[in-house]
Amino acid sequence: MPVITLPDGSQRHYDHAVSPMDVALDIGPGLAKACIAGRVNGELVDACDLIENDAQLAIITAKDEEGLEIIRHSCAHLLGHAIKQLWPHTKMAIGPVIDNGFYYDVDLDRTLTQEDVEALEKRMHELAEKNYDVIKKKVSWHEARETFVKRGESYKVSILDENIAHDDQPGLYFHEEYVDMCRGPHVPNMRFCHHFKLMKTAGAYWRGDSNNKMLQRIYGTAWADKKALNAYLQRLEEAAKRDHRKIGKQLDLYHMQEEAPGMVFWHNDGWTIFRELEVFVRTKLKEYQYQEVKGPFMMDRVLWEKTGHWENYKDAMFTTSSENREYCIKPMNCPGHVQIFNQGLKSYRDLPLRMAEFGSCHRNEPSGSLHGLMRVRGFTQDDAHIFCTEEQIRDEVNGCIRLVYDMYSTFGFEKIVVKLSTRPEKRIGSDEMWDRAEADLAVALEENNIPFEYQLGEGAFYGPKIEFTLYDCLDRAWQCGTVQLDFSLPSRLSASYVGEDNERKVPVMIHRAILGSMERFIGILTEEFAGFFPTWLAPVQVVIMNITDSQSEYVNELTQKLSNAGIRVKADLRNEKIGFKIREHTLRRVPYMLVCGDKEVESGKVAVRTRRGKDLGSMDVNEVIEKLQQEIRSRSLKQLEE
């Protein structure tokens, strides 16, 4: 009979099989009331599942991350319950958990309107407030199939036929008259599912295949309590204000249009930000001793067949042909960098060789996934590739890590989560090689005092990798940086160097990305700063304004003086009230506004205001220039007097 060991090391002995709920009741009524599920020997199970042998048990509550995921998953079933009551002929497809919520794909003979979604949410609340028990039943594959055939649930039948073994026992979850199929676990009672909101609808092909029927996807969010739900909705509201697409239009940074889906038309001010970001990256490349190269954006398909990209990636590649040859527009820079490395004999003395490129890449992303600057088809990668010996891996990874943190800190990103992905089951190379490579990555992180977590088995078949995920001011995660070891591509493309023993050897290749893509990172920065770019990045850093025409000559002189000092400056000599001009340039997020009246002309000074509405008073022009140059040169995140 089972001995149950709890997280604090205490044990409970039973003379019969028990469920997590039984153990929770044994500990106390408060824990039983909070019990959502259990973790038995590391595996999540329903609160009602029986434990027949000795086991480690943790009771899962709404305070646990797993508990919140279970609540969200059960809310997806609640959505199914409600939609079948409102529109009984709906066919249910899949309803998984996603970040911050859930969705359900449904086949419905009507297009859902906003009023429909509101009615659906209302019915969900009515059902949840009944606090009914969710009943789990394990059945045979045949019984599950018969259940869904009788109910006309063709998508569930398809899942059983194509994804579930005939000797398996699927879990059926009964919500009163509604039944759904799932691995679980789910909440034992709907009292846990009171704090949710339906967010939006979208189209989605069954199984993600455009040859299949288009379904309607209903998105929702769910939380453990009302406070958490409201906080999330407030974050969404703030995120909407910061939407880079909205700000990009307000500030005239760029636009997209139907004739070039997923391609960016950079306007002058947006391109200024792009170029300043390039200058910053180039400064760091020089500091960390990288070469900068430029490869062709299109190469013969034969090369992509050699690399393996054609076999595994061809659906995402744009192609064209000329003179009976097929060409691929590059989706990434690495094969081109190997071609550059292969020019001329290389010695171990030439390594490490660090090769960077602002590579113009294209990927045939599905049109439905395109999203402003965040998901595009044409983008500029800031990646680099380091060719080195196995002995140099640790030092080179160390340098990559320092560069990542050096660059992220410039933009004020402090919360960075790091994950180390290790060898998958299918891989190339010996265990000894993987042992050393994984150890090199781990030691490099440890030497930099960087906490990290392992993602076991999540590495690529050709090498382990480190992923850097930064969190913005709204605590949203953006996976940008990677350091990926590659033991395959150099060999596939016949890269070699002459070692100390005068024998030819294959170099290790380190793929290194920091920003990810210039376009996406500018989108991230636009939302992080809400368009209030630090002065060094701002397209226009200073606007000088006159009050009347009598100061026009003085304004023009100052404009030229600041421009000669390397400051991006504009003069506003329009015959408008000064308050109107200030408001307009404040809305344009111009960091500094210099106002010139008769008093300033006489004294040779300027009245300085910031875009945040702070009046810095009258200042000497040379002093203003000197302080602005220092702020720009240091790439400060703060303005004067902040």
From Swiss-Prot:
It comes from the Bacteria. GO terms for cellular component: cytosol. Its EC number is 6.1.1.3. Pfam families: HGTP_anticodon (PF03129), TGS (PF02824), tRNA-synt_2b (PF00587), tRNA_SAD (PF07973). Keywords: Acetylation, Aminoacyl-tRNA synthetase, ATP-binding, Cytoplasm, Ligase, Metal-binding, Nucleotide-binding, Protein biosynthesis, RNA-binding, tRNA-binding, Zinc. The modification N6-acetyllysine is found at K286. Its cofactor is Zn(2+). CDD domains: TGS_ThrRS (cd01667), ThrRS_anticodon (cd00860), ThrRS_core (cd00771). One of its GO terms (biological process) is threonyl-tRNA aminoacylation. It is found in: Cytoplasm. GO terms for molecular function: ATP binding; metal ion binding; threonine-tRNA ligase activity; tRNA binding. Residues 1-61 form the TGS domain. Binds 1 zinc ion per subunit. It catalyses: tRNA(Thr) + L-threonine + ATP = L-threonyl-tRNA(Thr) + AMP + diphosphate + H(+). Residues 243-534 are annotated as: Catalytic. Zn(2+) binds at C334, H385, H511. Catalyzes the attachment of threonine to tRNA(Thr) in a two-step reaction: L-threonine is first activated by ATP to form Thr-AMP and then transferred to the acceptor end of tRNA(Thr). Also edits incorrectly charged L-seryl-tRNA(Thr). Belongs to the class-II aminoacyl-tRNA synthetase family. Homodimer. This is Threonine--tRNA ligase. The gene is thrS.
